[in-house]
Structure formats: C-alpha cells, structure tokens
Amino acid sequence: MSIIIDALPSAYEYDGRVYDMQTDFKEWMKFELLLTDTDIPINDKSRRLLELVFPQIPPDENLWDFILWFYQCGKEGARASKKAKSQKQTAIYSFEYDDGYIYAAFREIYNINLITVPYLHWWEFKSMFRALHDCKIVDIMGYRSEEISRDTPEYHKKFLTEMKRVYALPKSLTEQQKLAELKKIRESLNL
C-alpha cells in the first residue's frame, strides 16, 4: 500500500459491515500513550484502546491484527540488523515529554500548527515525523539513540553523556516494546 497512490484507511470492514474508526494523529498519540502506560492492567488497557479507536467496536477476533497494521502505518516492522538487535534499545522520543519539540519542528519545517490543525491522518503525521530534519527534536533523538563505545573520542563521550542526561526520558518504551505490547494484548484476547 502506498500513501501517495492509495486512499488512506479510515474504517474497518468486517462481515459486510463498515466500522468507522479514529484516524486523526491526536487520537493515535493518545493510543500510544495509553499503550505505554504500565500502570493499567492489560484487559482494561485493551478495552480502552479499542474504545479510543472505534466508536462501535467490531466483533472480529482478528481486529488486533488490523490495529497493529494500522499503528505501523500499513508496514510490517522493519527487520532489525544483527548489530541493531545486539545494541541496547532506548526510547528516542515521547509524545508526552517531547510535545513542545515536536510541535516546534512541525511549525518550522512544515508550517503546520499541530494544536489547531483540524485533522491530520496518523499515517501522514508519522511520515512527516520520520522525515523531520535539521531541528531540535531530531538532535535530541540522535543524542538518545547514539551509542557510546570504547572508540568514541573522550570529548564526544562527555558531550553525549551530558546530552543523554539533559534529554533523558522517564522510563519509556522503545518502538519494539510498543509493538510487543500490542502483540501481547492481541494474544491475550485470542486465548
């Protein structure tokens, strides 16, 4: 599926019936925040996630496969390289804690006011978010993700260590952990 060629999904079809769904980026930001909330029991979380996405919940046992697909913008998770798998995974952004930086980046680069924009599809938002460049949030995500190795020059180690401290997120889930949480919810409901 291509977001440029194909119509962006806005509903779920099951058993000949079309179920409208929330597709605006703000609702899916809420979805991600709820997904990463470790204080909510999984059954309560799954119900609340469904209620957030669907005004009327489809009775399909495969619904979570669709939700996972939609959350990933119609793409399967990229296969991580062996090197990436062996590296310690760190969350590099948080919609809750980086909201100001994300807002500023969209204003600066795309001239989009994320506060007042009436609607922006989740897939459009995520595409633009991934393509951000030359802005503070990209620098911050770079600091958070860059690994400090033995080969890193001492001056850069000190700088990176300080930037990691300054821009540290409270315990946040990585992208892989978010997908794993969604899969765990899906599996718990398919008992």
Name every feature range the model reports, one short phrase each.
Residues 25-42:
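Short, surface-exposed, low-complexity cationic segments
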Residues 1-18, 26, 36, 47-191:
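Charged interaction scaffolds used for protein-protein
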